[in-house]
Amino acid sequence: MNRVFTIEQLRPIKDGMTISRDAKMGTSTGVTFFSLGKDTSISQECYDATAVYIGAKGDATFLIGENADKKNFTEGDCLIVPGGTLCGMETATGTVYTEMIIKKENTMNNIIKSGEVMKLKDLISYEEGSIANLDVVSNDTMKFVLMAFDEGTGLTPHRAPGNAIIFALEGKATIGYEGKDYTLSAGENFRFDKNGLHSVTAEGKFKMALLLVRE
C-alpha cells in the first residue's frame, strides 16, 4: 500500500456492486473500506458493538432504527451507531466510506450525538499557536481522535503504539515517516505501522482525524 492514498483508490466504485475490503488494522477493532455502486443498498442490520462510519466519496442515505430514519451522509461526515441499533444504507450516485466496529466497551466524547451525522472538521477548532486534540471515541485497544494544528505547529518525530490511519480533513501537512517526507492534503489518507517513526508539520492550518488500533 502507498503511504499516501485515498479510500476511493483502495476501494473504487463499481456499477451495480457493493464491495468491502479489510483494512487489516487488527482484530480488536474491525476496520473495513466499503464502496457501493449507484442505485445500490445495504439492508438494515445491527451489530452488537458500536459502529463508526466516515464518508470518503459520494453521497448516501443511512437508515437508522426501527423507523428507518433517513440521515444524509457525504464526504468528511461521521456517523456513530450504538450497538443493537438497526442500520442500513442506500445510494443513488455511488459512495465510498470507512466502517469501524469497536468490539469492546468504549468512552465517547459528550459532544458526540449517536445516530446523528456530524462533519468531522467542524467538531474541533483551531487554537492560536497550538495543537488541539479531541477524543471522539476510545477504549484500551483503540482511539479515534481529531487534531487541529494552527499555522507553524507540528508534532516532533515519535513512534506509534499501534497501526494507524490519518484522515486529512482540512488544509495540508508534511508527514515525516521513517526518514521520508510526504505531502498530505484534505481528502487524503496516510497509513503508518506500529512503532513507525513519524512526525506531522502543518503547512498553514491543518485538521485531521487519527484512528489508532493498539494490539
Model-derived regions: residue spans:
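Ordered, small/hydrophobic-rich secondary-structure cores
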Residues: 1-85
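Conserved short histidine dyad/triad with adjacent acidic residue
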Residues: 16-19, 30-47, 129-132, 143-160, ...
